Design a protein with these regions (language model features):
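Bacterial Sec-dependent N-terminal signal peptides
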Residues: 1-21
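The feature marks proteins involved in alpha-glucan
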Residues: 17-43, 73-155, 160-173
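Short proline/glycine-enriched turn/loop motifs at strand-loop junctions of beta-rich domains
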Residues: 47-54, 157
Length: 240
């Protein structure tokens, strides 16, 4: 049961964050790599509207604030798809896309397929995804359930679950609280065998730059679908 709970938690919080293949997956899902990092160069891709006349990618040193340090024009290689290959080791840098149409220049965006962002999610981050994988990640599989009627489900909000001063947990209100043995033990004592986790992706309503200010939201205002919510991390300024 412990393994079932842990794997259910991982599936609920992390399943969307580390897929890197561009081919069709075994479950029929399609993935898209917006950013592919290497020490020699980083490849960027963006699916932009057909009315786009040009797309630029802006590189920043900071996840928030500061001026852009480089701008690169992207090339249209297929219908609605734009690419750019930026030379050099960009790990630790941040980026945004900016689309131009015949009528106007759009606001900068991290892109809907960003997997890591700076504080408050306005800029995407260049990271090495392989470095973020915990041991055994590639072999992880979701637990099998014979029938949905066998499920005893507990609904969990990351912050609410562990934020109480009496919780006895070290990482109160954080993702890491669910890795603490006491947290898993508590869930087991409830008699549940599945966890329904409320939104874990990056949402807009909590200011991640103010971690010491009490803030709360259920999370149904998504900002970056494929990025973990920064306010649940131990340091939202470190994308990896």
């Amino acid at each position: 049961m412990k393994k079932l709970l842990i794997m259910a938690l991982m599936a609920g919080s992390l399943s969307a964050y580390a897929q890197q293949a561009t081919n069709k997956q075994g479950d029929g899902q399609q993935t898209f790599d917006e950013m592919t990092y290497s020490k020699e160069a980083t490849a960027f891709r963006l699916i932009a509207p057909s009315k786009a006349k040009g797309v630029k990618i802006h590189i920043y040193n900071e996840g928030a604030g500061g001026d852009k340090v480089q701008t690169v024009k992207m090339k249209r290689t297929a219908t609605d798809t734009w690419t750019a290959n930026v030379k050099g080791d960009l790990k630790g840098k941040f980026y945004t896309f900016q689309v131009e149409t015949a009528k106007k220049t759009m606001q900068e965006t991290p892109g809907v397929f960003a997997k890591a962002v700076g504080v408050n999610g306005k800029r995407a981050a260049v990271i090495d995804m392989a470095e973020t994988n915990p041991e055994g990640w590639d072999a992880d599989k979701r637990p099998l359930t014979k029938s949905p009627t066998d499920l005893v489900i507990y609904e969990l909000h990351h912050r609410d679950f562990s934020i109480s001063p009496t919780s006895g947990l070290t990482h109160k209100g954080k993702f890491l609280a669910l890795t603490e043995p006491k947290a898993i033990y508590y869930l087991k004592t409830l008699g549940v065998n599945a966890i329904h986790i409320l939104p874990s992706f990056d949402f807009a309503s909590v200011d991640e730059s103010q971690p010491n200010v009490a803030q709360y939201n259920w999370g149904y205002d998504p900002l970056n679908y494929n990025v973990p919510e920064g306010s649940y991390s131990t340091d939202a300024t470190i994308p990896s």
